[in-house]
């Protein structure tokens, strides 16, 4: 992708993320294009529809989590930190995950791949340090992500959703810690 095209795509993603957070997922796409300083045609050249735009934002957020996780690989509790950050991401992007729920399985592969990559090294570091269970696998990251994301889809008050998210995280951390492992 040419540099100018990549910059326009990044502006679209940033404008969309801000607009969705501020105004919800129903914000008109032409307003996102205007905020990014591009035309509608540029928006649709990059993203065929709203779901594709939302998916791209979600992938970008998980890739950012991966970068931040790799920067902490010297911390033996990095996998526990990763789960905490993943739970926060799931709560912060509840609307995004709802919007992509109906996508085809293949469309979600970039999210699954980014999540696996983000957590794999952290899992290995924390396992080597004896901080998390030795029998955890990279595939368990997907199970944990589904569990941690469930409260964001609950039809409850925002306060209850936050409480459910915190409790889900506590349970997940307790499940993955090595037997007799210290609380982070």
Explain the meaning of each model-derived region.
Residues 1-35, 52:
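Basic, helix-initiating cap at the start of DNA-binding domains
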Residues 24-25, 45, 133:
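Helix-turn-helix/winged-helix DNA-binding modules
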Residues 37-47:
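Short hydrophobic/aromatic patch on the recognition helix
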Residues 47, 54-61:
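Alpha-helical DNA-contacting segments of helix-turn-helix folds
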Residues 56, 63-92, 104-107:
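Hydrophobic alpha-helical connector segments
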Residues 88-121, 150-155:
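Short secondary-structure transition hinges
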Residues 110-111, 128-143, 159-163:
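All-alpha amphipathic helical-bundle segments outside canonical DNA-binding/catalytic cores
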Residues 116-129, 154-184:
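C-terminal peripheral helix-coil segments that are non-catalytic and often amphipathic
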